[in-house]
């Protein structure tokens, strides 16, 4: 850059700083790059698939999927993990369906959880914005976008047409709160439902509610699906769950994680640790027996996971080893995910032979 351009740029930067304050325009090289802080989801496999060890703070996240796929369970798991780190969390329950007893079983400290059950969509989003601007909240969950009913629709008659009202409401609210979320370093999670587009001949007919604004503003979008049942004998005790990272602005997207959600207990973390520890050589598997550092810890995955539950020090050590190996730059976690699924299938077959 020649001297005249340098002087012109310096004058422009000086004027901008006087008018808008110091730091309005910065050179990216002036400050060291910092890793994006993350909050664990409670699922080790999903934390690895997200690439940074969890959901990013200071960003908007959308979690969507069919009914009973585990959307609320996943967000309550995030809240439980955040509270363990001393974070303050809020739950905007637009669906009026939050069960405090179930949340407590998942590890949520319900006494400290802030809960709002707003009457209208405008009220829900205004409360969310005020909580963000307080700079005192670390995690806010809005359950769900589909239940954010505009005031005009509530006050109108049942058969009235209100085309695009909810989409305009979401677009306006997201424009308003996005900057505040970044400044407050607050994680805001929107739960969303799936609808079907009529007359789609090619491609997926599925879409999410509330228009397109949330798709653009969200830094991470997670598609959660129930893929099967977890059984003990003939009794169904949980769900096999697959989460696909369909959008990710903080790490490579399109990775996926598979884990189990046990009814009344939440995400089966110890089972994930056993699978990943075997995959990466921290735990040895011979037939149906699992061994750690030369000593047997259990026959079958369920018994090995129970051993980890009874020995939290070993469980934490294994989890740390896995995170240190897979959450370092240069690790191809997409390839890891496909290998993990293949190994999990092999182990399931071996356990079934017990």
From Swiss-Prot:
ATP binds at residues 65-72. Keywords: ATP-binding, Cytoplasm, DNA damage, DNA recombination, DNA repair, DNA-binding, Nucleotide-binding, SOS response. Belongs to the RecA family. It comes from Pseudomonas savastanoi pv. phaseolicola (strain 1448A / Race 6). GO terms for biological process: DNA recombination; DNA repair; SOS response. InterPro entries: AAA+_ATPase, DNA_recomb/repair_RecA, DNA_recomb/repair_RecA_CS, P-loop_NTPase, RecA-like_C, RecA-like_N, RecA_ATP-bd, RecA_C_sf. This is Protein RecA. PROSITE patterns: RECA_1, RECA_2, RECA_3. NCBIfam families: tigrfam_recA. Pfam families: RecA (PF00154), RecA_C (PF21096). Can catalyze the hydrolysis of ATP in the presence of single-stranded DNA, the ATP-dependent uptake of single-stranded DNA by duplex DNA, and the ATP-dependent hybridization of homologous single-stranded DNAs. It interacts with LexA causing its activation and leading to its autocatalytic cleavage. The keyword DNA-binding applies. The keyword Chloroplast does not apply. One of its GO terms (cellular component) is cytosol. One of its GO terms (molecular function) is ATP-dependent DNA damage sensor activity.
